[in-house]
Amino acid sequence: MRPESLVTDHTIYACVMGSRAFGLATEGSDTDRRGVFLAPTPLFWRFEKPPTHVEGPADEQFSWELERFCELALRGNPNILECLHSPLVEYADATGRELLALRDAFLFRGVHETFVRYAHGRRRKLDADVRTHGAPRWKHAMHLLRLLMTARDLLRTGALTIDVGDRREELLEVRRGEVPWPEAEARMNRLVREAEEAAARSPLPQEPDRRRVEDFLTRTRRASALRAA
């Protein structure tokens, strides 16, 4: 089976991510599509296993096999967790809807470390841009601020909301370069501190609910095998 066929024929969940999902789209913004496919169980009985992810077949499209998606989500991967909370769902079959119903099972206090570590990587790139070019890439600075806001609010409330809502304009001001870098930098530092404070008393559980996720994955694999019998 061609990798593209796994996406076209076996997708269980598809959504739009990026600026459009974050409420930060402007004229000319790309449409970034993300999805989850369920590789038929018999494909795992071969020496050559199905891929864990597939790029395409459309432009700006990327999909994960369900098991890999769940593994990354259980580790608190920011990109994966945000996919499960996109406000722009394009498709979800019965299995995809069950995955969405499980999304809170992936949230735990460890997201503080994974989100902030991811943010630190982006921050280093911005600092390098400032040293080399005298200014950051403002679009990247905007998205870093958004990510830190999301992490802080998740730790405070226990709920992951990725649409920036009424913070849109203040973030777009950063994208347009209307906020001096020292001020943007100060906002980032403040958000990191606030996320750390929120982590100490977060309503999130200490660990994700691996048992629920594993039960879902096992039942899904079994059902796929029975359909192929």
Language model region names:
Residues 1-94, 101:
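An N-terminal structural lobe/cap that precedes and organizes the functional/catalytic core
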Residues 23, 154-157, 225:
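Glycine-centered secondary-structure boundary/capping sites
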Residues 52-53, 72, 123-126, 224:
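Amphipathic alpha-helical interaction segments
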Residues 91-214:
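Conserved nucleotidyltransferase catalytic core and NTase-mimicking acidic/glycine-rich helix/loop elements
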Residues 210-229:
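Short, amphipathic C-terminal "tail helix"
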